[in-house]
């Protein structure tokens, strides 16, 4: 069974991707910090044998690195992002933290693990 990581797997697009992959028998590791844009759609699959959920901010590089190293996924779908333009104008800091710094952390983890795992990164913007 191919392992994949989905960051932001509890948002609107993420839940649909996670459920699509589960139905196709992938082992899915969902990483999400469960902010305002999360939903509980994945509750229906939480007991599936091919699904794991970790409440985690992708800015936590140490834990992110650990999960990638442990599961050695074949692909990572990066959907983790702060959304809603209005919110970004009123308070841009969380958007910069997740959308830029968090993505950088993910890239750094993959760079540091490049000799240990062969993984494809699919970045959704």
PLM region spans:
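N-terminal Rossmann-like NAD(P)+-binding domain of SDR-like oxidoreductases, especially those catalyzing
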Residues: 1-125
